[in-house]
Amino acid sequence: MLERCKLKILKGACGRVKLYIILVVIPAIVISFFVYEKEKDTIAAEHKQEASVLLNLHRNKINYLIGETMARMTSLSIAIDRPVDIKKMQSILEKTFDSEPRFSGLYFLNAKGDVTASTTELKTKVNLADRSFFIKAKETKKTVISDSYSSRITGQPIFTICVPVLDSKRNVTDYLVAAIQIDYLKNLINLLSPDVYIEVVNQDGKMIFASGQASHAEDQKPVSGYLDDISWNMKVYPNPVTIEELSKSLVLPLSCIIVLLNILFILVLYYLLKRQTQLERSENEAQKLELIGTLAASTAHEIRNPLTGISGFIQLLQKKYKGEEDQLYFSIIEQEIKRINQIVSEFLVLGKPTAEKWELNSLQDIIGEIMPIIYSEGNLYNVEVELQYLTEQPLLVKCTKDHIKQVILNVAKNGLESMPEGGKLTISLGALDKKAIIKVVDNGEGISQEMLDHIFLPFVTSKEKGTGLGLVVCKRIVLMYGGSIHIESEVRRGTEVTITLPVSAS
């Protein structure tokens, strides 16, 4: 019933569409989702790695620019002659300014903060004593780098490097101030990375400048790092994953997934169709066997009654006609009647195998009772018969004794008949996992694979005078007792028949 339910989906185009959706469409969607997420994460990780490389590149560039400017201003402050020649200082500042586009202006301040020399033309007197960088440089006597601010001289956004000029007693006499354009840093970064959004913020989180793309995703986390000499934090935002990138990376894996799922669908469909064919064939064979069994049982009863009468009349005639020739004919008639009775008995088992009463019987006793018959038959065929008991434990089976005898005798007789020129027949009895195992092995002619595939079908036989019902009846009996029968054979090598029966507790 379960197999039928499973195979209903194969009926009609609708069923196959459902199967295709179950095996291909749904798995493809689920797998594609995970592949999509994985590829997206992979590309995002690559972008983050690229952002880290750019961060190090730009940070090192700005660190070098600031460090090189500090070194230049420090060297200039040391090289200043005393007393200071303002015109000469003006000339030095202008030459330095003209050689570097980074500067917004270079200034020389006296101790009071007045601008005494400048690269920018001053219309009025300018004093920078109120600037925080001037105050700090005056207090610490060390180079100070300011935060960004708007220049009161040029109006440009700048940051300054203020270097105090010390005399021999380490007193501050003057100051060198280099104003660096914020736009220069922005253009420098934008030139190298125009497609990447980069922010530079101070320690308070105030934006100094931004370059690259105009915006970034709100949930996008930047790669960041502080500059060495100034408390600015540079943030590089990885580029978002684009549809074009995902499309290129997903074409191959998704194509492979779809191809593999379609192959799986074809294989499953083939398997289910094969199972459906086998199921239909099994149902047909079962129906045929049931029909044959019903017909055989009813026919057997009809045949057995007149056979009994014929047998009785033959016995009367045997007593009346004592002639040697007459007795010969009577014996032949009796043999044929016995053969007909045997066939009728097989018909009855085939039709109603459950009619007998089941009892607990020892397999050792059953085999022991039929071995004289098998030994006798073996002598007729010039075959050596060997019996092996592989266990000393009594093997009790709930069954009808005659049925088990019939199975073993039938299988043994088949083995003997397969060795017309002599050979060896081995019958063994053993136990495994609460099951009795009976093996009948011969080294006769063997059975072809084609015949083995149909060996348990009614009326299939390789014998000239066989009915083709013997093994059918044997299998019916064994299955009736919850056992199994299996045949392995190789042409010109022999045959092994294995019968398993469930063992009952004593």
Swiss-Prot record:
What InterPro entries does the entry give? Answer: dCache_1, HATPase_C_sf, His_kinase_dom, HisK_dim/P_dom, HisK_dim/P_sf, Sensor-like_sf, Sig_transdc_His_kin-like_C
Top-level lineage group: Bacteria
Q: Which Pfam families match?
A: dCache_1, HATPase_c, HisKA
**GO terms for CC?**
plasma membrane
Question: Topology relative to the membrane, per the entry?
Answer: Multi-pass membrane protein
Q: What is its EC number?
A: 2.7.13.3
Where is this gene product found?
Answer: Cell membrane
- Per the UniProt entry, what are the Gene Ontology biological process annotations, in alphabetical order? sporulation resulting in formation of a cellular spore
UniProt GO MF annotations: ATP binding; phosphorelay sensor kinase activity
TM spans (from-to): 17-37, 250-270
The Histidine kinase domain covers 298-505
List the signal peptide residues: none
What keywords tag this UniProt record? ATP-binding, Cell membrane, Kinase, Membrane, Nucleotide-binding, Phosphoprotein, Sporulation, Transferase, Transmembrane, Transmembrane helix, Two-component regulatory system
EC class of the enzyme, as a word: transferase
- Tell me the residues on which Phosphohistidine occurs: H301
List the induction conditions. Expressed during growth and early stationary phase.
What does it catalyze?
ATP + protein L-histidine = ADP + protein N-phospho-L-histidine
* Phenotypic effect of disruption: Cells lacking this gene sporulate normally in spo0F mutants.
Q: How does it assemble?
A: Oligomerizes, probably forms homodimers; oligomerization is assisted by FloT. Interacts with FloT.
Known function: Phosphorylates the sporulation-regulatory protein spo0F and, to a minor extent, is responsible for heterogeneous expression of spo0A during logarithmical growth. Also phosphorylates spo0A under biofilm growth conditions.
Q: What is this protein called?
A: Sporulation kinase D
Look up and give the organism this protein is from: Bacillus subtilis (strain 168)
